[in-house]
Amino acid sequence: MELLTQLLQALWAQDFETLANPSMIGMLYFVLFVILFLENGLLPAAFLPGDSLLVLVGVLIAKGAMGYPQTILLLTVAASLGCWVSYIQGRWLGNTRTVQNWLSHLPAHYHQRAHHLFHKHGLSALLIGRFIAFVRTLLPTIAGLSGLNNARFQFFNWMSGLLWVLILTTLGYMLGKTPVFLKYEDQLMSCLMLLPVVLLVFGLAGSLVVLWKKKYGNRG
């Protein structure tokens, strides 16, 4: 817990030298792995801010706090394994009360968007859906519910995971190298670190509102 606190303090202070410390960077990789795994894999964790975190990671790479190839590899594994768990939820646990309950608590428009993408584009929808919050968690579950072959799913799963991580991280890296960013580095870094927190709060609040409506809406 102390190491996690030090990590957050180093991030907020933009202390890239401390972040590059082996024990600190190990904790950072662990936290990022868990967040991306959960966001891609478990429906109740779909509100986690994966997109903005990847952009922040790209900036940290630009500042020398993290290595580019190992970060891309590790986070691709996290996203793809999480997506596989989501697929398994649909394939083997889709009819269980727990998974059906999770599905019912996601906003209806995300269900509609995910179903539309999957039925219109098939497996290639995974490539598109990776870049849409909530949908990237829901699509693999729908693929599993449809009885889709695991081997075909895995090909698109790992390809889309790599593209998602690579594109957003590279965007963050390029942002961190721009003259505008270098000029306003302190302010922009603070915004980039606050953005995932703000999105997390809004996502969690939205999920709680949906849960509340499901529980009490029918009583009115």
Swiss-Prot record:
Residues 49-52, 95-154, 213-220 are cytoplasmic. Disruption phenotype: Double mutants lacking both yghB and yqjA show incomplete cell division, temperature sensitivity and altered phospholipid levels. They are also hypersensitive to several compounds known to be exported by other drug efflux proteins, including ethidium bromide, methyl viologen, acriflavine and beta-lactam antibiotics. Expression of either yghB or yqjA can restore the wild-type phenotype, suggesting that these proteins have redundant functions. Both individual null mutant strains grow normally at all temperatures. The chain crosses the membrane at residues 28-48, 53-73, 74-94, 155-175, 192-212. Changing D51 to A/N: Abolishes the ability to restore growth, cell division or drug resistance in double mutant. Induction: Regulated by the CpxA/CpxR two-component system. Keywords: Cell inner membrane, Cell membrane, Membrane, Transmembrane, Transmembrane helix. Pfam families: VTT_dom. GO terms for cellular component: plasma membrane. GO terms for molecular function: transmembrane transporter activity. It comes from the Bacteria. Residues 1-27, 176-191 are periplasmic. GO terms for biological process: FtsZ-dependent cytokinesis; response to xenobiotic stimulus; transmembrane transport. This is Inner membrane protein YqjA. The gene is yqjA.
